[in-house]
Amino acid sequence: MLEIVIITGMSGAGKSLAIRAFEDMGFFCIDNLPPQFLPKIAELASATKEKISRIAAVVDIRGGELFDDFKDVLQELKKDDRNFKLLFLDAHDEVLIKRYKETRRKHPLSHEGDGSILEAIQKEREKLEDIKRYADFVIDTSTLLPKDLKEKLFEIFVQQKSKEAMLITIMSFGFKYGLPLDADLVFDVRFIPNPFYVDTLKYKTGKDPEVKEYVLKWDVTKEFLQKLFDLILFLIPNYAEEGKGQLVIAIGCTGGKHRSVTVAEELKKTIENQGYKVSIFHRDIEKDIKG
């Protein structure tokens, strides 16, 4: 059966890197495809003598007015029961601005409004808001290096396919550095007593045994973890049955170094003990400690 991956998302979030990664994975790749051509591409691929089994196409706002029909095309593909996945790449506004300044490229919507990069990014985000809701996979590239993005795509579209299982990612983060854009579920653990205020623990992380012991010794932590484990283990099979291919669970504390790290590690162990494959990412663990 023909497999189609449609790549979209914010300009500057890494779509060009992504399409090159798909080419390396053996996909037939098309960049800047008007959405109206998607159903036709699927028909042509099925009719070719040299069988094309996997297609990756970038569809984004460079298509101008043609892009306005993207949502209708996605609905048509779903209605026709086409085997496609929608990948949405995102990044925080300040990261996108920095990338544009470094490359000195113009944003596709820079001709609208006052011409500022920020306004163009905000307009694009509004245009893509509905499209993002259709995404099977959302990746926040704000903190990813090109090789990290390539590895993540390989994990989703090659390794995961062989396992036929949901890709589960647990992320710890600090609220002071912003919410992760690609999280499906966010849990706030700032109610747990903070090791930061213990002099001997301040400069350690939630991976250190002393910090783990401190975080896990409280009754409120024990009760929360049991409720969290029950909820997540209930949700995973139900999400999988619904066809969800990716689940990103974010655990947040103030700075992302102590409580969230410990809780994320405990959650990973519990899910893995049920036979699921889990990856973990401590987004802010290397950030400077400032309280």
From Swiss-Prot:
Positions that bind ATP: 9-16
Keywords: ATP-binding, GTP-binding, Nucleotide-binding
Gene Ontology molecular function, alphabetical: ATP binding; GTP binding
Domain of life (superkingdom): Bacteria
InterPro entries given in the database record: P-loop_NTPase (IPR027417), RapZ-like (IPR005337), RapZ-like_N (IPR053930), RapZ_C (IPR053931)
Residues given in the record as GTP binding sites: 60-63
Listed Gene3D superfamilies: P-loop containing nucleotide triphosphate hydrolases (3.40.50.300)
Protein task: Displays ATPase and GTPase activities.
Family from the record: Belongs to the RapZ-like family.
The protein, known as: Nucleotide-binding protein Athe_0320
Organism: Caldicellulosiruptor bescii (strain ATCC BAA-1888 / DSM 6725 / KCTC 15123 / Z-1320)
Origin organism lineage: Bacteria, Bacillati, Bacillota, Bacillota incertae sedis, Caldicellulosiruptorales
